[in-house]
Amino acid sequence: INPYLAFETLGALSDLPAEKVRANYIKAVGKGMLKVMSKMGISTFQSYCGAQIFDGIGLSSSLVERYFTGTATMIEGVDLDEIAAETTERHQRAYANENARLDTGGAYAWRAEGEAHAWSPNTVANLQHAVRGNLPDKYRAFAAGVNDQSRRLLTIRGLFEFKPAGVAIPLEEVEPASEIVKRFTTGAMSFGSISREAHTTLAIAMNRMGGKSNTGEGGEERDRFKPLPNGDSMRSAIKQVASGRFGVTTEYLVNADEVQIKIAQGAKPGEGGQLPGHKVDRHIASVRHSTPGVGLISPPPHHDIYSIEDLAQLVFDLKNVNETARVSVKLVSEVGVGTVAAGVVKARADHVTISGYEGGTGASPLTSLTHAGSPWEIGLAETQQTLVLNRLRGRVAVQADGGLRTGRDVAVAAMLGADEFGFATAPLIAAGCIMMRKCHLNTCPVGIATQDPVLRARFTGAPEHVINYFFFIAEELREIMASIGIRRVEEMIGRTDLLDTRTVVEHWKARGIDLSRLLYAPRTAQGVARFNSERQDHGLANVFDRDLIAAAEPALNRGTPVHIERDVRNVHRSVGTMLSGQVARRFGHEGLPQDSIFVRLKGTAGQSFGAFLAHGVTLELSGDGNDYVGKGLSGGRVIVRQPESANRDPAQNIVVGNTVLYGAIAGEAYFEGVAGERFAVRNSGAVAVVEGAGDHCCEYMTGGVVCVLGPVGRNFAAGMSGGIAYVLDEDGTFESRCNMAMVSLEPVVEEEMLSEREYGHGGDLETSGLVEIMSNLGSGDADRLKALIA
């Protein structure tokens, strides 16, 4: 590709030499392409070429078949004639004889006479007046402005009209607002991205109503787990588990009514969450178990999810930690999401969120805001159709999320298949947000998206404001339901027959729009569920930990140390996880004294051995482990060593699989042998010793100590922003395998030979060299590591 016009234009605009301008442009475009490839999971340029990694929205089938062959499209729209007409119009405007005013713009922030926004100063003012004064008339003015889509055509749902299901009924016969609001949740906005004041205001409001607030991916302060003296609760009912696993402790998980696995975010699909360093103060860093002042970036994927089977394992892990909580999976709206949602249900998730591109835009990159994601209407309709066709719909609750604002939006979402409804921007506006678009700068003037104590003091929101907003929505929904003859929300879920497209669309480009694929209702046998009506069977009745919990009762009830010996097989997954959930529920993150529950096992453990292991629980395995050993380690101790009968060199033998200690918070892990890839990825505080590791060791690590007494693979320490890693570099080639973007290598300042001897847990770890300890470490890390290994 030769972008000659870009080269010539930039050369004319810049005083730099032409070669420099071209080099800068190529570098910028290359970075952009790499970003897109990363978001879409593409590793090579050849795979990028012809990948058609986009959906067609509002293009006619004939146009797509001819010019974008193979591209998926759910909504019919413009053909070549309309495109040609618009191109001609633009050309005429550009080369008209008279001087024309430049467009006002306003693609990002609202401007008068600029691009239309759903949130304008008028709608923001109407909503805030309504909720602060509890003024229904002001809310009606707000809703009327937002719902007026016939003129502005801002959303797909604006093209729908409601059809009556029967004769209108009195409002008194409709489900009360107090029940409807229990279907509402607030979006996943992390503590860190928004202030404590804003975060707790949302939580208190939702808890009072019986709805649910969402922590986002930044953890939650422990003091919020206990009710306030007046009976209110600041505890978020939904605890999110994102790819960064920030703040995901066992205690965090047991204090949840729902645990949400964030696969992606509607506003920026394919990207991990990011928190700029200037928003990571000491308090935020403490909650997230990271370093103050250092920006935090979640990996684009979950490194323990590369298939539906892996997702099923994570669902199983989380249900073992907290078997009373629902497990949710958050997906992004796109063509094909229905197939993914079916897999999620088969992985035994209890809840699926379909996230649209309109929401979550506070700090998303501009390119993602304008070019990524798709409307929730598309993904929700496909999800409903796919789940109903496969008789899976009754097993899962489906939530629509991303840009919901009014009761009309809720009604359309329900008819397209949603059981529940997520709101984020609108509740923040009810609490005082004025859409300054400064969320990423830490300069929010109303104290919401900032950690600056001076700005936080300006926060004037209250739980009552958020509660008023949600009750206004519920009352608007009730009025719609009464007008079309519906008594209960579940009666309208999946009822696309109650939606009709507008017969007159006041825009010349919209004449070819066809929404029939969104409104398709699968033909199914009578009795096939259209909404969530049953509970998933998670297979927890006979898990291995039931026996461990029974044997550990003296420690759990009286604090008496216990020693348990069992054989284990690879069908025994998540060993120690349910036991740790019991410890955390009773004793919090501190758990029990070390080795209070000592479990000695023999055999081959299944996936997620020692996942979320709580303080006071020690698992010693004589044998080997599979993937995800010590995932989310929360203070416990994991030891994996070769069987006594083994006749092999542990430095040459893989003893545990991939992604070991993913998201570990605290605790210790010792492995007599080699680990697979991504050892200690996102380690936040655990201390680990291993005799070798594969590629990507210590990736995204923010704390803790890792000692590798053997060779490692490539890309060591990629994205590592905290913690210390020691690597035995016998052949002097380690530097070539280390990613130096964020770390530096230091030779040993002072050496101390550690004799090879048993360290108290069953044998030598190091058989081929000497461990070197730096003498100038802070916080006693050197002494601690010596003691652990020795």
Regions found by a protein language model. Name each.
Residues 455, 467, 480-484, 493-496, ...:
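Long, distal/terminal scaffolding or interaction modules
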Residues 15-27, 35-43, 113, 117, ...:
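Hydrophobic alpha-helical scaffolding
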